[in-house]
Design a protein with these regions (language model features):
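Active-site-adjacent segment of 2-oxoglutarate/Fe(II) JmjC oxygenases
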Residues: 2-19, 147, 154-169
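Short beta-strand elements
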Residues: 30-31, 36-44, 150-165
Length: 177
């Protein structure tokens, strides 16, 4: 009926003293710490692999603080997706870290020298889910298929809205188990 997508990718940086999940390196370049994530690769040609994600959400957390909302620091996080340039469209980062909006803030640039898509983003310490979406030229709709793949086993969260001519009648969130 519609593409299932794939599980979100995960990363976590809770301290500048150690590398977190999916973190290659942390270094300080005044005025921010920089987090270099491990290079990501396309997942559209492989087989489905389950990963317990949070369906695109993020959580502000830090290991060296008592109140993450006020004490967590901001880091510049470097995302890289190694692949050939995808013709006839653009690549975007997606998830709650970008309010699920595909715009210039989430659009990745292609580096022909390193042969990868790259994006640096200022984020607060924590755990993040994200995915890469391909948006064809002339469209505003992101597709998971060309980069993340579509797998029927993917566990998704769906919002169902019952609407009449005048107003919203009901709303329900359903988890695909």
């Amino acid at each position: 009926i519609f593409p299932a997508g794939n599980e979100y990718r995960r990363m976590e940086f809770l301290s500048n003293k150690y590398n977190g999940m999916h973190v290659e390196n942390i270094s300080f370049h005044n005025p921010y710490y920089n987090v270099e994530l491990m290079t990501d690769y396309r997942r559209d040609k492989g087989t489905y692999q389950y990963d317990q994600d949070q369906d695109g959400r993020f959580f502000i957390r830090c290991s060296d603080c008592n109140d993450p909302d006020t004490e967590a620091d901001y880091y510049i996080v470097h995302f890289t997706l190694a692949c050939d340039p995808l013709p006839d469209g653009s690549v975007y980062l997606n998830g709650e870290l970008f309010n699920n909006v595909l715009d210039e803030k989430s659009k990745m640039g292609y580096n022909f020298e390193t042969k990868q898509y790259e994006k640096a983003v200022l984020l607060k310490q924590g755990s993040y889910n994200y995915q890469y979406l391909f948006v064809p030229t002339g469209s505003s709709v992101g597709q998971t298929g060309p980069i993340e793949g579509n797998y029927y086993q993917t566990q998704n969260e769906y919002s169902i809205y019952a609407v009449s001519y005048t107003h919203l009648r009901a709303h329900e969130t359903v988890l695909d188990l």
